[in-house]
Amino acid sequence: MSGNENHIYIAIDLKSFYASVECRERDLDPLTTNLVVADAERTEKTICLAVSPSLKVYGIPGRARLFEVVQRVKEVNQERSQKLPKRMFEGSSCFSDELKEHPELSVTYVTAKPRMALYMKYSTQIYDIYLRYIAPEDMHVYSIDEVFMDVTHYLNTYHMTAKELASKMILDVMQETGITATAGIGTNLYLCKVAMDIVAKHVAPDANGVRVAELDEMTYRKLLWSHRPLTDFWRVGHGYRKKLEEAGLYTMGDIARCSIGEERDYYNEELLYKMFGINAELLIDHAWGYEPVTIADIRGYKPETNSIGSGQVLHCPYDFEKTKLIVREMTDALVLDLVEKKLVTDQIVLDIGYDIENLTNPDIRKKYHGEVKADRYGRFVPKHAHGTANLDTKTSSTAKIMDAVLDLYERIVDKNLLVRRVSVTANRVVDEHMVSNETEFTQMDLFTDYQALAEKQKAEQARMEKERRLQNVTLAIQDRYGKNA
């Protein structure tokens, strides 16, 4: 039995968060409006950040590509038109309740361009609502739309059950922001997450439309040991599912039974460790409904190494020089991020992913003689470029980091190929005060002009101070007028 048996956790997930925000901004009902959040100015291959619940009813997944939405809505309209006397629509609507009442209307939807700053604003407002009830040290923000809470010591204070407390917070969020949410309650972090992700979808909503589900280790085994597919469970991806099913394990109950098999049996713990290595331990714990990690453990965790970075998929293939401008912009933004967080680094990593057109365009293809790899969609592309630049000292200097990145770019990127993905990462990141407090010792010799060296170091120090002032001014302007100022 885990050490969390006396704990009570709540997980809250904001329903179709991005789509709900866009609906509220338009004074539309998030539950009945057909809306997708996607940048239609790119291509129809762009991924939708969110799909509203009423569109999901048609079988459109939450992370569909825009062309999949277009195709599915077209199919739905073909099906609807077949039932009409003249097989012709008299109008259209993006509202599910109106579409149910009027079969003569075709299905349409609103396409909203993503606005991350707006979503962050809503998320912060909602987090502030949670803070009215729960102290920050008892919360873990899992993502922009999901949070975990340890409410063990709050229930007696508020004279509420965990379900009543979860419902109260969700109702406050709905009344103040218009965003609906779902909650899961469990005796550990895993169980509250699974209760929210799987069980809450099938429970009846309360009078305010709030869905809350509860699990402990025994009800988890009773309700979910036979649940399929395995990918519905936290931390089980398609790769895990494929491996498990190839071994004849289709449910969490199968995994739990496998873990207690004897050494002479085919199905035993060793089989799982052969498939997943040390990660099998977590999978076995979760199969039984165990999770030893607490929110206090998460908040107290200090990683051995830190990194900070960003990546982007370009909306169309870029040539060498255009991509270089993107790399320059991303590096500049990365350095400002380091300065804002008072961090320094001595290692930069650059990743460049090439576009499929490099192999489909005959003129480019004949110039390329390098390695070819299949991407995650099974398409063949030139092998991506990856490189690391090590700096002499830990720094947040724009000049030093930019020189290192651009030199790396020139060395590793094929000038003849078109680029589709770029990522820039600062590794081995530490607090700048840790570096400033370190004392450096230099071995002196008879041949160095130490006066000239001191003057050079003084000039470099002055340049660095001037650069830092400029960086701070840039950050102040961005803080006031936005990142694009």
PLM regions: where:
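Gly/Gly-Pro- and Ser/Thr-rich, intrinsically disordered tail segments characteristic of DNA damage-repair
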Residues: 1-295, 454-485
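DNA-contacting surface of Y-family translesion DNA polymerases
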Residues: 2, 11, 232, 238-419, ...
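Short, Lys/Arg-enriched charge-dense amphipathic segments
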Residues: 135-139, 159-171, 202-215, 301-307, ...
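Short aromatic/hydrophobic contact patches that present stacked aromatics
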Residues: 148, 390, 423
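Short, internal active-site loops enriched in acidic
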Residues: 152-154, 187-192, 352-359, 427-433
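Residues at or immediately flanking beta-strands
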Residues: 180-182, 349, 423
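C-terminal hydrophobic structural anchor segments
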Residues: 407, 411-480
